[in-house]
Amino acid sequence: MINLRKTHPLMKIINHSFIDLPAPSNISAWWNFGSLLGICLMIQILTGLFLAMHYTSDTLTAFSSVAHICRDVNYGWLIRNLHANGASMFFMCLFLHVGRGIYYGSYLYKETWNIGVIPLFTVMATAFAGYVPPWGQMSFWGATVITNLLSAIPYIGTTLAEWIWGGFSVDKATLTRFFAFHFILPFVIAALAIVHLLFLHETGSNNPSGLTLTADKIPFHPYYTIKDALGLTFLLLILLSLALFSPDSLGDPDNFSPANPLNTPPHIKPEWYFLFAYAILRSIPNKLGGVLALLASILTLLIIPYLHTANQRSMMFRPVSQTLFWILAANLMTLTWIGGQPVEQPFIIIGQLASILYFMPILMLMPLAGLFENYMLEPKW
C-alpha cells in the first residue's frame, strides 16, 4: 500500500514541504531561523488570542484591563510576558534571518527575497500597532510621534494623519483601530509566510557555499527536523528565561504609567527592535527627509539583488565583502544604541555618521568589493 502522506491531497503538501523535501546536505544552523520564525508567529498568535479575550480597547479601561490580565487572570502574567518578549525574539530571529540571506547570497532567489521583505514590513507594522493597546505613556506618545510623520507627506499629509487617527489627535478611535489592525495582521503574515515558502520550494534552499548542489540532497526529515528542534529548544530557553526572570528588561519604564496627553515623557522612543530605524529617522534634520530615510532603511533590501556584482554567490570565500558585512552589522548595533539616546551631542553626530555608514556598504562598497574580488580571482598570467 502506498504511503498515505504521498497520496492524500493535504498530507501531500505537508510531505513535500517538511518531510520528503530535498535539502542541501551542508546547511548550517543559520538556516534554522525560518522555522523559528514560524514558531514565534504561532506563539504570538496564541498568546495574543488569549490576551484579546480579556483586553478592552477603550481609552478609559485599556490600561487597567492589562493590569487585570496580569493580576486576576489565570496565568495572565505569563501570557502577557510571553507575548511581550515573544515580539523581541521574533525580531531577533528576523534580523538574523535577513543577515543570513545577505551573507550567503540568498537574495539571488529574487522572488523569495522580495516576498520576504513584504512580511518584514507587515511584522513591523504589526509590532508598532501592538505597542499602542497597553495605553501606557510610551504607547500613547510613540503612536503620536510616529503617526505624526505622515503629516510630512506634501499636500495630503495632515489629512492622512487625521484619517489614521480618526480625529484630530491619538484618541479612542486610534486605539480601537490599532487593536483591530494588531489582531488581523498576524494572519496576513501567516499567509505571506506560506507564499514565501511556496517560492522557496520552487528553487530549493541556498547553502553556505552558494553552489548548486543538486546531486547532494538529503530528505528534510529526520535530519533537519531534529536540527530545527534543537534551535527551538534554545529559542524557548531564552524566551522563557526572559518571560519568567526579567520580563520588563526590554520594555520602557514609562509604560507603567497610564497614557496622559498633558504630560510628555522626557525621551520618546520605540521598542529596541525599531531603534536602528528611529536613529536614521532622527539623523535627518528635515521631517520629510527623515521619513524618506526611514523608508529607505528597509526598502534598500529590495534592491540588494540588483547590486550583486561578484561571480561568487556566497560571502564565504570573499574576505573583503565579509569585512564590509560585519562593519554593517556593528553599525546596526551602533544605530540601535543611538536610537535609545537623547537628541544631544555627541549622539546627534554619531547617529548621522552611523546612518551614512548604514547606506554606504549596501549601495556602494559591497558592489565595488564584488568587482574587486572578481578582479583578484582572475588569472594574471
From Swiss-Prot:
The keyword Protein transport is annotated on this UniProt entry: no
Cofactors: heme b
Complex formation: The cytochrome bc1 complex contains 11 subunits: 3 respiratory subunits (MT-CYB, CYC1 and UQCRFS1), 2 core proteins (UQCRC1 and UQCRC2) and 6 low-molecular weight proteins (UQCRH/QCR6, UQCRB/QCR7, UQCRQ/QCR8, UQCR10/QCR9, UQCR11/QCR10 and a cleavage product of UQCRFS1). This cytochrome bc1 complex then forms a dimer.
Compartments reported by the entry: Mitochondrion inner membrane
Sequence intervals crossing the membrane: 33-53, 77-98, 113-133, 178-198, 226-246, 288-308, 320-340, 347-367
Keyword set, alphabetical order: Electron transport, Heme, Iron, Membrane, Metal-binding, Mitochondrion, Mitochondrion inner membrane, Respiratory chain, Transmembrane, Transmembrane helix, Transport, Ubiquinone
Protein name: Cytochrome b
